[in-house]
Each structure stands twice: as C-alpha cells, then as structure tokens.
Amino acid sequence: MKHSEGFLRLVNDAKTRVKQIDVAGYLALRASGAPHLLVDTREESEWAAGHVAGAIHLGKGIIERDIETRVPDHAATLVLYCGGGYRSALVADNLQKMGYTSAISLDGGWRALKESGVELE
C-alpha cells in the first residue's frame, strides 16, 4: 500500500520519539521470558483474519481510550504491531504522551511477524 506524504511525515515524526524493535529483537525478548504484552493495533477485521497467538487487540481507533483499563501499569513493556509498523509508531507516540514508559513499535509489523514463523491464530 502506498501511503500519502502527509501520513508518512506524521509517522516519521513519531518515529523520532519512539523506541522501535525489529522482529529478531522481539523474538529475542520473547525467548528471554521478560514480561511484556504484545498488542495488535490493527482494525477489527484485520485482527479477525489472523493475529499472533497470545496478542491482545486494541485497535488504533480505541487504544488511547481503553489502554488504561486493560493495562493500568504504565511501566509495562508493550510491544505494539500493526500491518507494517506505521500505525504502531503513532500509537506508541501517543501512549508515551499518556505516561507509558515502555511502549515499543514493532518495525515491519504483521507482515514481518508472519514471515518469522511465530504462532498465529
């Protein structure tokens, strides 16, 4: 999908402020046993079509409204993914503004996760 210039400017600006992790880094985090939550920020229809086993779903349209109910610990490590790493960067930026100190955007998103061989549902 080709993204608009305005959207890419917004995403690139957010990426200057957020921590990102690639799939290899996420798999290492997961293998280490370090506590974290994997959060799928895609739309409901994307989630229903398939997602990473064990992930929770909080779509980009509602995550800021619902995150504090679902994850009240602002120090929790949140690894956020979307389709390719754009929307998750925007979400990570907003969560940091809300006081979440370890919101991480997964670069490559769902596409990279599928290619990695992680268990899907």
Each predicted region: which residue ranges?
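Rhodanese-like catalytic fold shared by cysteine-dependent sulfurtransferases
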Residues: 1-37, 41-77, 83-121
